[in-house]
Amino acid sequence: MNSNLLVLPILLPLLCALVLVFTKEKNRLSKILYIGTMSVNTVISLCLLIYVLQHKPITLDFGGWAAPYGIQFLGDSLSLVMVTVASFVVTLIMSYGFGRGEDRVNRYYLPTFILFLTTGVIGSFLTSDLFNLYVMFEIMLLASFVLVTLGQSVEQLRAAIIYVVLNIVGSWLFLLGIGLLYKTVGTLNFSQVALRLDQIHDNKAIIIISIVFIVAFGSKAALVLFMWLPKAYAVLNTELAALFAALMTKVGAYALIRFFTLLFDQHTGVTHPLLVFMSCITMLIGAFGVIAYRDIKKVASYQVILSIGFVILGLGSNTFAGVHGAIFYLANDIIVKTMLFFIIGSLVYMSGYREYKYLCGLAKKEPFFGVAFVVMIFAIGGVPPFSGFPGKVLIFQGAIENGNFIGLALMIITSLLAMYSLFRILFIMYFGDNDGEQVDFNPLPKHRKTILGILVAVVLAMGIAAPVVMNATENATKLNMDDNYFHSIVNSHLKEGNK
């Protein structure tokens, strides 16, 4: 396969975003462009993933400049799983909204900046060096800053200030980590960094750099440093809340998985217990949040925080099963959290309220939502045969192999609390008493029900056909847990380029 195809998943959304600037007045044409572009992007990413699973990873050196001197993209099973899932959910998100009922500014500019954000996300998954990872993070964050602040309410502006400030601090830490690492090893290419870190005997320097990256990426993933997330997500409209929940924290978690399996595996006795500790704190924060709030958007926001704790617990176990579970659960959670925020946003749209006490009788009026809600709860809880089950079982196994029984117990307890918080909403939807206050539910557009139906089908399919998905995530785990395998791929490519 031509390695130049690897640039398409990032190039298509970028070009489409630029074209939309000139077609914003033509709503129908714009919709065809951005939905069509992301649909094609999903198909291309899936084809690249299938090729990689059947053959070998793809590397692309831009301008013919071989790494570590040039910009390099790496399409392996981990990056392409994430790119495929991300492209798929962005397609659904952009199909879900932005109709004539939207505010003029939102209708004109949201799709453009969503595509810019998608460009940064996909670039973060594909890049093979730290500086370009930083560049992609900044593209993603700048677009997200616009999306968060593109509102007219005081509540949204307040949430935007917190979001922007904390993410800028995280970016500074990321840049600081890059500077310290370059000073230590003299390169930023992933494979070169991995090789040279193994030769460094200054343990304190490596540990300090590792901790800087943990905090930097942890702030992006809402790992302990969660303050920006609930307020920001709660004030966004349905499409943006789903987009942020699906992708923003996942990029930080992806970076942690890449760094602490491929690069910083020299001092696992320090870094990985820290990751486990932070994951446990994050799970507790998420659990308290889902129980404490009656605002269903904030309940959903804390569900995002809780799931990040699960992913990092698997990574922190430093076992094959744990890392495999983290990767599977991360990919699955992109889809499940999209579904969660679509459902929550639809409930707010139909009832006009964010507190679940106003949802009394809705499930009886809209039985489809009752079914979709149950599927979502079981997927989040990791109940077989739903899609959350394989990932959680592997994370459980990793925690047991690592002897981390406290983390295991916390994961079980917080998973039950997560399910309880959602069953509480479901119970109100079926059996709640509105105490005489009648709420007239607005009908949900048919195309939005169709998209929810697609997500329900995908969640069920990922659970039932889990071995197919696990083939890709297991391959990704082998790649990231085996330094020699990764180096042999990159080095063989470099030799071919020098011939």
Curated annotation (Swiss-Prot):
One of the record's GO cellular component terms: plasma membrane
Single GO term (MF): NADH dehydrogenase (ubiquinone) activity
InterPro entries on file: CPA3_Na-H_Antiporter_D, NADH_UbQ_OxRdtase, ND/Mrp_TM
Keywords, in A-Z order: Antiport, Cell membrane, Ion transport, Membrane, Transmembrane, Transmembrane helix, Transport
Tree of life domain: Bacteria
Pfam families hit by this protein: Proton_antipo_M
Cell location: Cell membrane
Protein's membrane topology: Multi-pass membrane protein
Parts of the chain that traverse the membrane: 3-23, 32-52, 78-98, 108-128, 130-150, 161-181, 206-226, 240-260, 273-293, 308-328, 330-350, 368-388, 403-423, 450-470
Main location: membrane
Gene Ontology BP terms: ATP synthesis coupled electron transport
Quaternary structure and partners: May form a heterooligomeric complex that consists of seven subunits: mnhA2, mnhB2, mnhC2, mnhD2, mnhE2, mnhF2 and mnhG2.
PANTHER family: NA(+)_H(+) ANTIPORTER SUBUNIT D1, NADH DEHYDROGENASE
Family, as annotated: Belongs to the CPA3 antiporters (TC 2.A.63) subunit D family.
Protein name (database record): Putative antiporter subunit mnhD2
